UniProtKB/Swiss-Prot annotation:
A purine D-ribonucleoside binds at H5, E180, M181, E182, S204, D205. InterPro entries: DeoD-type, Nucleoside_phosphorylase_CS, Nucleoside_phosphorylase_d, Nucleoside_phosphorylase_sf. The gene is deoD. The active site is at D205. This is Purine nucleoside phosphorylase DeoD-type.
Length: 240
C-alpha cells in the first residue's frame, strides 16, 4: 500500500510512531532502543522502521524539516497506514534565560507564524494542542525515570533564518519554551484526521546565548527525550 512518499506495505507500521526530523536519528532510535527492527520505508531516504520496545510494537520514521514536510508524512501514516498516535521527538531552540541547552520540553501547545493551519481551518486560528492523555503519560514517564522536563508552549516557525529577530522578545514575554518548525502542523493534521499527537523536544541551542550542540550530538544523543517518549507509550497503554 505504497503512497507517493512511503513505500511500506500494508501493516508495516505500528499504531504509534515516533517521528524525529532527521531520518538518521530515526535510524539511531531504531538501532539503539528497539528490538527485532525492520526497515519498512526509504523513499527519498526518509527512513522508517518498526520494532519492539519492551515487547510493545512501535515504529519510528523521519519527517523532515518544516510543517509542509512533516504534514505529508503524518497525513499518510494516519490515513493510509492506520497510525493512531504520533510523537515528534526533535530539537528546538530556547529564548528564555531559564531554559537551558539539553533541557527536555513537552509541548502542550504550539504557536506558529505559518499560514498552513489557517488554510486548513478556513482562515481561522486553530489552537494547536497536544493530546492530553499523551501529555500526561509523558510527564509521568519523565518523573518515573527521574528526568527533568518542562511542559508548555512551543513556537513552530516557518523560517529557520528569520529576519524578525525582535519576535524572540515577544516569544520570551509570552513564555514560549522552545522554537522549532513542526509541532503546530503535526497537531493540526492529527486533529483533522482523528489521531493523537505530542511533541517532545530537546533544546539543541540557545538563541540568546549562542550555546549549541553539534549536529552529531543532535543525531546520536538526546536519549532522555527518546526514553520519555517510549516509556509514555507503555504508560498510555496501561491507562487505556
Amino acid at each position: 500500500m505504497a503512497t507517493p512518499h512511503i513505500n511500506a506495505p500494508e501493516g508495516a507500521f505500528a499504531d504509534v510512531v515516533l517521528m524525529p526530523g532527521d531520518p538518521l536519528r530515526a535510524k539511531y532510535i531504531a538501532e539503539t532502543f528497539l528490538e527485532d527492527t525492520v526497515q519498512v520505508t526509504d523513499v527519498r531516504n526518509m527512513f522508517g522502521y518498526t520494532g519492539t520496545y519492551k515487547g510493545r510494537r512501535i515504529s519510528v520514521m523521519g519527517h523532515g524539516m518544516g510543517i509542509p514536510s512533516c504534514s505529508i508524512y503524518a497525513k499518510e501514516l494516519i490515513t493510509e497506514y492506520g497510525v493512531k498516535k504520533i510523537i515528534r521527538v526533535g530539537s528546538c531552540g530556547a529564548v528564555r534565560q531559564d531554559v537551558k541547552v539539553r533541557d527536555v520540553i513537552i509541548g502542550s501547545g504550539a504557536c506558529t507564524d505559518s499560514k498552513v493551519n489557517r488554510i486548513r481551518f478556513r482562515n481561522n486560528d486553530f489552537a494547536a494542542i497536544s493530546d492530553f492523555d499523551m501529555t500526561l503519560a509523558a510527564v509521568q514517564a519523565a518523573k518515573q525515570k527521574g528526568i527533568a522536563a518542562r511542559v508548555g508552549n512551543l513556537f513552530s516557525a516557518d523560517l529557520f533564518y528569520t529576519p524578525d529577530v525582535e519576535m524572540f522578545d515577544v516569544m520570551e514575554k509570552y513564555g514560549i519554551l522552545g522554537v522549532e518548525m513542526e509541532a503546530a502542523g503535526i497537531y493540526a493534521v492529527a486533529a483533522e484526521y482523528g489521531a493523537k499527537a505530542l511533541a517532545i523536544c530537546t533544546v539543541s541551542d540557545h538563541i540568546r546565548t549562542g550555546e549549541q550542540t553539534s549536529s552529531e550530538e543532535r543525531q546520536l544523543t538526546f536519549n532522555d527525550m527518546i526514553t520519555i517518549a517510549l516509556e509514555s507509550v507503555l504508560i498510555g497503554d496501561k491507562a487505556e
